[in-house]
């Protein structure tokens, strides 16, 4: 049957509409072009803004800040919500980096594709506003970037201080090369300086079928080279979810620098539109001002006067310089952010005045100070250079420990080296060390609630050291004198002078047996390997000490050695374990909590490492998340004093008093009220 002609267009229209409905939404091509950014609709944060002449300025020269600019709407990179197939995309942009010096800049910038425009957790400096030290490389970042980096950062395995890299979820590039391009005529590689203050054009192309990323760059006046600078297969489907935002990120460090984008184009499933070079705004260029004739006359006279004045001041200056001289070596550049100037520490402690002296530890004196710039209270420990390991390795370990961040750890802020001394800078703890609170007659007796909170806090800090940080940190000297109390009487584990670091999943190395008698696990006498289990043993002794108000090893009235673990175990066998709680509490304690602490302390003190609970279990027991198994006193059938003698610790007791450690006490990093 033939339809009447008037109805034919309507039928055809319905047919095309029906076919159009079958076309997936993901096939819609996204395309935009910005020849300059005047009036451009972009999303900004940080320092990013558009200048009066249309430049997208990501950073304005302010130190240690970041800037981001994004196309405001998310783009669909996967071909459909239930598909992992990726769409191809292409982008072209012109950038420029203007530093204070032609051959030196302050970190770089990056083209980015991100799941979210919110990068508030990212850090400036070497992190370029993309990630931070904790999440660098995490798959949950969902971040793809092409970086233009002007600083060599060894922590990211950078190849040079002038390179281009392809980044996935972090700043350890999956592919990188020195900035430059391949000449189409000769095939020779032409170097480019990212900090030349000249505009550079960049093309980034991704093939959704082959998963190949090509990055090409050239000076603005050079046509696009045929051979890309970088070419890498990258499975972006595992990085980018269905939709993502495209834009730019940059950050500054300690030097003056501005990062600019002059123009930008983007297209999904096709070549990015060519930018109109003649329409792009110009980069600011700093030219030296012509010297005036007046300056030519005045300058020689002023120079002569200045030389005389400088000569008069040199003697005073040199004396002050010698006074505040420090020992610095080239390898310490890596640890720069963790280094304090001796001058600041000198003024902070009033010239290391005796009035500021908190105490004298095993390695040196400890002073209370107030940093002149931040007014923060600190404890400064002056340590003599030891020979137990190379200074470079020692400083590296100090800096590594300085990166620990937990509310129940004393923060190591940094260090300074000078004339045979190493100065360590810590947070100041106003309420002193726990052992002083437990044993000093003039102190008010700690309430049970305070003791239980301190025990749980130190356990939380120990879990962070053992399992939650990037490396395993074995403390090796857990005891009451190494637990400091902040202004709110929260316990913070400190003194990492004996601590050892090793990677998760590896075995600790054999070392000299060091620590404090009464806290040393029995197996250390024959294995020499400090481990998480030996730390748990020391923590068990610590729990008993806090609950009972007695030292792990002491002398009775008849000069007999009394081991706290054995005494508590005897009382448990007699059915009176809570009778061991500190009598100064006069019975004012929660019996269930005290029983838990005492029984858990005994369980941690088991002579077999495998019978002790893991650190996470220990925290779960103390927090009440998991009940402590019902154990009879016969399960702990041992005599700790006999075990210590069997393991050969008696000579060690003679060398290291029971109330001190081979590394000196950390309690001097605090002061009582």
UniProtKB/Swiss-Prot annotation:
Tissue: Mainly expressed in root epidermal cells.
Cytoplasmic topology ranges: 318-673
Pfam families named among the record's database cross-references: Lectin_legB, Pkinase
Localisation per UniProt entry: Cell membrane
Residue intervals passing through the bilayer: 297-317
UniProt keyword terms in alphabetical order: ATP-binding, Cell membrane, Glycoprotein, Kinase, Lectin, Membrane, Nucleotide-binding, Receptor, Serine/threonine-protein kinase, Signal, Transferase, Transmembrane, Transmembrane helix
Induction: Induced by salt stress.
Glycosylation, residue list: 41, 60, 82, 118, 138, 191, 214, 235, 276
Residues covered by region (Legume-lectin like): 32-270
Catalytic activity: L-seryl-[protein] + ATP = O-phospho-L-seryl-[protein] + ADP + H(+); L-threonyl-[protein] + ATP = O-phospho-L-threonyl-[protein] + ADP + H(+)
This protein's record includes keyword Hydrolase: no
Range of residues in the leader sequence: 1-27
Membrane topology classification: Single-pass type I membrane protein
Active site: residue positions: 477
BP-aspect Gene Ontology terms: defense response to bacterium; defense response to oomycetes; negative regulation of response to salt stress; protein phosphorylation
Annotated GO CC locations: plasma membrane
Residues where ATP binds: 358-366, 381
Protein name: L-type lectin-domain containing receptor kinase SIT2
Gene name in the database record: SIT2
